[in-house]
Amino acid sequence: MLGSTAVMLLLLLPWTAQTRAVSGSSNPSWTQCQQLSQKLCTLAWSAHPSVGHVEPPREEADEETTDYVPHILCGDGCDPQGLKDNSQFCLQRIYQGLVFYQNLLGSDIFTGEPPLFPDGPVSQLHASLLGLSQLLQPEVHQWEPQIPSLSPNQPWQRLLLRIKILRSFQAFVAVAARVFGHGAATLTP
């Protein structure tokens, strides 16, 4: 089974420390963000590894290790009142998560053997992630988040990591899509 050290390396990505605030005082196009986030959500939820239905094993320290995976929490200002008062912190949190998952989808966990999907939806996920993150952070930035070199020894280990990452990604983009849906409905002039 994949060691807890490898899982911790995956989850300890410095996604919170290296990002900067979403630029500018103006908000993004909520309608464009809503459309892209809905597309991303659809792609993420239709993405299934080609291994059939596999339940990842539960790990004892699962709650501890998932603390480092991007989540949109109550204190992130993504609630209706928080978005109305100042949406920048929420948008920053969503941007950080998008960059985190974009880098994971480009890592050898998803590009290595065995192939994840027969038709290549990972490239569609990448394109949608890039489009949405550019709406939130249109300026070129100098930092590159680092992803630890995590190469599972066995193909089955890679498959389990993929399932775990996809589940976390699905939950993240579902909440982000709801945030952008609310923003498009209530914050668009």
Curated annotation (Swiss-Prot):
GO terms for cellular component: interleukin-23 complex. Pfam families: IL23. Its main location: secreted. InterPro entries: 4_helix_cytokine-like_core, IL-23_alpha. GO terms for biological process: cell surface receptor signaling pathway via JAK-STAT; defense response to Gram-negative bacterium; defense response to virus; inflammatory response; innate immune response; negative regulation of interleukin-10 production; positive regulation of activated T cell proliferation; positive regulation of defense response to virus by host. It is found in: Secreted. Belongs to the IL-6 superfamily. Associates with IL12B to form the pro-inflammatory cytokine IL-23 that plays different roles in innate and adaptive immunity. Released by antigen-presenting cells such as dendritic cells or macrophages, binds to a heterodimeric receptor complex composed of IL12RB1 and IL23R to activate JAK2 and TYK2 which then phosphorylate the receptor to form a docking site leading to the phosphorylation of STAT3 and STAT4. This process leads to activation of several pathways including p38 MAPK or NF-kappa-B and promotes the production of pro-inflammatory cytokines such as interleukin-17A/IL17A. Heterodimer with IL12B; disulfide-linked. The heterodimer is known as interleukin IL-23. Interacts with IL23R; this interaction enables recruitment of IL12RB1. This is Interleukin-23 subunit alpha. It comes from Cavia porcellus (Guinea pig).
